[in-house]
Curated annotation (Swiss-Prot):
PANTHER family, alphabetized: ACYLPHOSPHATASE
EC numbers, comma separated: 3.6.1.7
Keyword Hydrolase: yes
Domain Acylphosphatase-like: 8-94
Family, as annotated: Belongs to the acylphosphatase family.
The organism's taxonomic lineage, starting at the top: Bacteria, Bacillati, Actinomycetota, Actinomycetes, Mycobacteriales
NCBIfam families linked: PRK14422.1
Membrane recorded as keyword: no
GO molecular function: acylphosphatase activity
Organism: Mycobacterium sp. (strain KMS)
Assigned keywords, A-Z: Hydrolase
UniProt protein name: Acylphosphatase
Reaction(s) catalysed (UniProt annotation): an acyl phosphate + H2O = a carboxylate + phosphate + H(+)
Source domain of life: Bacteria
Residues making up the signal peptide according to the UniProt record: none
Amino acid sequence: MSAEPEVRLTAWVHGRVQGVGFRWWTRSRALELGLTGFAANKPDGRVQVVAQGSREDCERLLGLLEGGDTPGRVDKVIADWSDAREQITGFHER
């Protein structure tokens, strides 16, 4: 296992991303990358994605979120980076 410290990616995904399987798709990609966290629908129509793991794997997830192969339609993704602040087990849809 790498000695690299874990990071936390918080991504706000804008577009038609609710009711189209986007959170399920995000969870599947995150688990494939070995990340922990969650994807949550927000009342304003966005999806909040919080992922923790290596910087490299979180950057890969961010690239997938910004790519064109997601369910629905992603108009933009706003990402914020920080140190992993808490222990999260698994990756969940909220």
